Amino acid sequence: MSTKKTFEENLQDLEAIVTKLETGDVALEDAIAEFQKGMVLSKDLQKTLEDAEKTLVKVMQADGTEMEMDA
């Protein structure tokens, strides 16, 4: 049974992929596979941030204060 990685773990994985691709020492096929993994991680991280922002807005509204957040 696999456990879901934390935001920080996914961010570290994405940073490792970016570093690996920036070195240029990766075969084309491997680079494409790593790029695809990176895109999936990037989308997951973005969704996590958007969900966190929505949660914060709800908390602020429940508290009675208004807060506008730029999306």
Curated annotation (Swiss-Prot):
Reactions catalysed, semicolon-separated, are: Exonucleolytic cleavage in either 5'- to 3'- or 3'- to 5'-direction to yield nucleoside 5'-phosphates
Q: Which residues form a coiled coil?
A: none
Q: What name does this protein carry?
A: Exodeoxyribonuclease 7 small subunit
> Which organism's genome codes for this protein?
Streptococcus thermophilus (strain ATCC BAA-250 / LMG 18311)
Q: Which SUPFAM superfamilies does the UniProt record give?
A: XseB-like
Question: How is the quaternary structure described?
Answer: Heterooligomer composed of large and small subunits.
State the EC number(s). Answer: 3.1.11.6
Family per UniProt?
Answer: Belongs to the XseB family.
Designated gene of the protein: xseB
**What GO annotations for molecular function exist for this entry?**
exodeoxyribonuclease VII activity
Q: In Gene Ontology terms, what is a biological process of this protein?
A: DNA catabolic process
Where does this protein chiefly localize?
Answer: cytoplasm
Give me the Gene Ontology terms describing cellular component: cytosol; exodeoxyribonuclease VII complex
